């Protein structure tokens, strides 16, 4: 997914002579994914005096799933059909055990390595202490610390928040999925989404019409850039399949749980029994879901782009 994000950054940057610098910079992190990136760009564009660019960021966020879903679904479907063809061929020839062993060899190695290196963290050891209220308090303290450090270092608070979150989670001081454990992720998403809406308050119907061209250019170039990066260039070899690589490239526009839902629908459409479905889910779902979660890096991209407006 990171290569797909890089493709969008390069491709949309080349459209600056067509749609303008502020439009391109505002749209790139949004296409790269993550609701917080959209909030960062709408806020930065509004403060910089570019209300149309802020509106473009908000509209891009609203539209991107409609653009990314057909490409991710069709590409994943082709990949699943190819896999199930090999699965059925091996089953009919009596070599299914060998086929499954070969297919799961690398996954088993990775799983064993992770199990061997796993350690019990402080958050896991004292899991009972981390109640919803404690987790909310930790999130608030982390947010305040990020804002304070941002004022001190002049680095965007969102970037610092992401870095601090990764550091404290890896150290085991805070539990993984802190907001989910606090049962506050839905509320936080609602608040962040509400912060985007004011970006549309200062534009007229004629302004919305003027945004059609930049919106079309951004998505057309994004699709073309992802195609070149993930299917034409040898990047697809990382995932071992051109169709899957192309589909993963669009996960940045979807995020979780959209990528999970696409995985389930594709596997249900192709599989004829539970064994086939389990096999396909083990191959399709991890690639799409991880690809969608990797788009959280767009917060870093947004922090950089916001400073360039």
Question: Where are the regions a protein language model picked out?
Answer:
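Entry/N-cap segments of selected transmembrane alpha helices
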Residues: 1-11, 60, 134-136, 186-190, ...
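Small-residue-rich segments of transmembrane alpha-helices in multi-pass membrane proteins
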Residues: 1-9, 26-37, 91, 168, ...
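Transmembrane-helix bundle segments that line or gate the permeation/cavity pathway
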Residues: 2-43, 52-89, 96-98
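Alpha-helical membrane segments and immediately flanking helix-loop junctions
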Residues: 16-52, 63, 71, 241-296
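Structural signature of hydrophobic alpha-helical transmembrane segments
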Residues: 21-30, 153-164, 186-191, 212-222
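C-terminal ends of transmembrane helices
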Residues: 69-73, 168-181, 230-237
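Structural signature of multi-pass alpha-helical membrane transport proteins
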Residues: 113-186, 199-201
């Amino acid at each position: 997914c990171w290569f797909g994000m890089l493709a969008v950054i390069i491709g949309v940057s080349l459209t600056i002579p067509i749609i303008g610098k502020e439009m391109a910079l505002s749209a790139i992190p949004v296409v790269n994914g993550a609701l917080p990136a959209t909030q960062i760009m709408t806020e930065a564009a509004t403060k910089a005096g570019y209300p149309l660019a802020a509106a473009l960021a908000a509209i891009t966020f609203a539209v991107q799933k409609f653009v990314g879903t057909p490409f991710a679904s069709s590409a994943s479907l082709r990949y699943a059909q190819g896999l199930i063809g090999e699965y059925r061929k091996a089953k009919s020839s009596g070599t299914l055990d060998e086929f499954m062993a070969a297919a799961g060899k690398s996954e088993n190695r990775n799983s064993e390595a992770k199990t061997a290196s796993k350690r019990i963290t402080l958050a896991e050891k004292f899991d009972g202490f981390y109640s919803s209220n404690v987790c909310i308090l930790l999130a608030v303290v982390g947010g305040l610390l990020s804002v304070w450090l941002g004022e001190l270092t002049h680095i965007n608070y969102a970037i610092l928040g992401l870095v601090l979150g990764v550091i404290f989670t890896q150290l085991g001081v805070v539990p993984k999925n802190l907001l989910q454990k606090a049962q506050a992720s839905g509320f936080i998403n609602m608040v962040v989404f509400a912060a985007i809406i004011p970006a549309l308050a200062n534009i007229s119907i004629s302004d919305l019409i003027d945004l059609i061209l930049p919106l079309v250019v951004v998505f057309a170039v994004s699709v073309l850039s992802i195609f070149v990066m993930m299917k034409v260039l040898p990047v697809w070899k990382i995932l071992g399949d051109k169709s899957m690589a192309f589909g993963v490239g669009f996960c940045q526009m979807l995020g979780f749980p959209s990528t999970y839902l696409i995985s389930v629908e594709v596997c249900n459409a192709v599989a004829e029994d539970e064994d086939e479905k389990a096999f396909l889910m083990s191959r399709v779902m991890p690639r799409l879901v991880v690809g969608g979660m990797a788009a959280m890096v767009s917060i870093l991209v947004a922090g950089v782009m916001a400073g360039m407006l």
